[in-house]
């Protein structure tokens, strides 16, 4: 009776032949959940070969452990050590970008200075026009004051001026 229970338990935990042939994904999920001690201890080398007896069935998918390690090694080499030619090329590109940027900055500065010079000329012209107008208005004001002084003086001095003084 116990033998039947254990055999039915074993049969229920293992996938049927139809499940195995229909798709490899459920088979991989089951294999990933159960790892043997050998699979846990195995560490891939940087050369791309796995240490241990054989690669397991779960690595036979689209990206194997070797491909993964080679991809990470390739990325780390690309990031870490650049060849002298790459370094020189990168330096030359940086210098060229810097040269172009400096030239653009010089051109912007030149345009800004010419704009400022034009503005200075315009303001100087406006200032001279305003100074001329001020001078004209001051002369006109002084002339009007003089006329006002003469007209008020004539009225006072003419005949009504003595009466105005006598009444006080």
UniProtKB/Swiss-Prot annotation:
Residues 116-144 are annotated as: Leucine-zipper. GO terms for biological process: abscisic acid-activated signaling pathway; gibberellic acid mediated signaling pathway; positive gravitropism; positive regulation of anthocyanin metabolic process; positive regulation of circadian rhythm; positive regulation of flavonoid biosynthetic process; positive regulation of transcription by RNA polymerase II; red or far-red light signaling pathway. Gene3D superfamilies: Single helix bin. Expressed in root, hypocotyl, cotyledon, leaf, stem and floral organs. Keywords: Abscisic acid signaling pathway, Activator, DNA-binding, Nucleus, Phosphoprotein, Phytochrome signaling pathway, Transcription, Transcription regulation, Ubl conjugation. One of its GO terms (molecular function) is DNA-binding transcription factor activity. Residues 58-75 have a biased composition (Polar residues). It comes from the Eukaryota. Residues 7-26 have a biased composition (Low complexity). Residues 1-93, 149-168 are annotated as: Disordered. Phosphorylated by CK2. Shows a stronger interaction with COP1 when unphosphorylated. However, phosphorylation does not affect its susceptibility to be ubiquitinated. Homodimer; homodimerizes via the leucine-zipper domains. Heterodimer; heterodimerizes with HYH via the leucine-zipper domains. Interacts with COP1 WD40 domain. Interacts with BBX21, BBX24/STO and BBX25/STH. Interacts with SPL7. Binds to SHW1 in the nucleus. Interacts with HDA15 in the nucleus. Interacts with PFD4 in the nucleus and at low temperature (e.g. at 4 degrees Celsius). This is Transcription factor HY5.
């Amino acid at each position: 009776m116990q033998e039947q229970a254990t055999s039915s338990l074993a049969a229920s935990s293992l996938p049927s032949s139809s499940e195995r042939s229909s798709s490899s994904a459920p088979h991989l999920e089951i294999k990933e959940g159960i790892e043997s001690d050998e699979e846990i201890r195995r560490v891939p080398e940087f050369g791309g070969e796995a240490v241990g007896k054989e690669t397991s069935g779960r690595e036979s998918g689209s990206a194997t452990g070797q491909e993964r390690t080679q991809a990470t090694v390739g990325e780390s080499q690309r990031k870490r050590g650049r060849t002298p030619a790459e370094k020189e090329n990168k330096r030359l590109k940086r210098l060229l970008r810097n040269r172009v940027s400096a030239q653009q900055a010089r051109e912007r500065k030149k345009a800004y200075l010419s704009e400022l010079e034009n503005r200075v000329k315009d303001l100087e012209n406006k200032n001279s026009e305003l100074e001329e107008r001020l001078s004209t208005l001051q002369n006109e004001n002084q002339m009007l004051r003089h006329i006002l002084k003469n007209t008020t003086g004539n009225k006072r001095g003419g005949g009504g001026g003595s009466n105005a003084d006598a009444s006080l």
